[in-house]
Amino acid sequence: MRRAAKVDTNQAEIVQDLRELGCTVQSIASVGRGVPDLLVGWKGKNYLFEIKDPAKVPSKRILTEDELSWQLAWRGQVRTIESTYQALEEMA
């Protein structure tokens, strides 16, 4: 049986901020198996974001084996972010 997906503590704030800016945001963290945390729609484009918590030590912010494997196999873009600001930079 698969363990429940862990959601980074900063995810709720990022989701709220993006929604307030007019983005559609769907958490897909519960899919697990390395799938990114958020699917974001903004100005007719989709973005996949893996969220890492900047409050954790750097060794705890690296991609897991599953996350890395998923990203290497994915034929689209996916970005790792730690803040709303980084998400907005990626969507600019």
Give the positions of each predicted feature.
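Catalytic phosphate/metal-binding cores of nucleic-acid and nucleotide-processing enzymes, i.e., regions
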Residues: 1-92
